[in-house]
Amino acid sequence: MISIDSSAMQTEAVDLANLPAQDTALEIRNLDLRYGDKQALFDVSMKIPKKQVTAFIGPSGCGKSTLLRCINRMNDLVDSCKIEGEILLHGQNIYDKKVDVAALRRNVGMVFQRPNPFPKSIYENVVYGLRLQGLSNRRDLDEAAERSLRGAAIWDEVKDRLHDNAFGLSGGQQQRLVIARAIAIEPEVLLLDEPTSALDPISTLTIEELITELKQQYTVVIVTHNMQQAARVSDQTAFMYMGELVEYADTNTIFTTPKKRKTEDYITGRYG
């Protein structure tokens, strides 16, 4: 089993099956997803607690990134995709026809595997979403830029070159800039799809430290192939295999005393 430093665990384990509505950020109910004739998710149900870090782990192709992208309807961009079931945010199914998808994605931000800054200045990257929302007051934009860059733990590194091109930053800095851009519009939920897979170990550590800070303000859901990373940063872990949610519990339980044989086999490296 993977050892976990209990001193690093920031929150107490919660009863995920009986999580009260006021403590639930998202609830996924009986979710199925198909790409054409191929089913990628099978009857997934889970509750994701507010202001904690939930990790999705599992072997390649298990459906973890597919599930993550369901949470802000990124899979809508795939023509052959068909979804059944519900994902509830504030008690409303985000797949209801009345839902404003653009508004949903403002409330549920996403950061991808590779840093994707825009070909603009550092400053304009951060305030881009705010400008789209109609914010034009320079003082308000300046305050939002500083707040977001501080929130992404990169302010001290860029405060004297805010108007330099974002492509001049290192990979790790670019990823933190992208996180700053995501939190500038103040989402409730932040989705991270393997956010450190393209980064060096030092940059990875910086992002992991940032994730533990982000949950003070946001609900964070992370997909990672790195089990040690999941053990370090998450409060809950969901293990997925072949499109099914095999086991979902507090991270300490998943990595030390899993209840399902498939989970134990994956954690101990018997496959994956």
From Swiss-Prot:
InterPro entries: AAA+_ATPase (IPR003593), ABC_transporter-like_ATP-bd (IPR003439), ABC_transporter-like_CS (IPR017871), P-loop_NTPase (IPR027417), PstB-like (IPR005670). One of its GO terms (molecular function) is ATP hydrolysis activity. It is a peripheral membrane protein. Pfam families: ABC_tran. ATP binds at residues 58-65. Residues 26-267 form the ABC transporter domain. It catalyses: phosphate(out) + ATP + H2O = ADP + 2 phosphate(in) + H(+). The keyword Coiled coil does not apply. One of its GO terms (cellular component) is plasma membrane. The keyword Nucleotide-binding applies. It is found in: Cell inner membrane. Part of the ABC transporter complex PstSACB involved in phosphate import. Responsible for energy coupling to the transport system. PANTHER family: ABC TRANSPORTER I FAMILY MEMBER 17, IRON EXPORT ATP-BINDING PROTEIN FETA-RELATED. Belongs to the ABC transporter superfamily. Phosphate importer (TC 3.A.1.7) family. The complex is composed of two ATP-binding proteins (PstB), two transmembrane proteins (PstC and PstA) and a solute-binding protein (PstS). This is Phosphate import ATP-binding protein PstB.
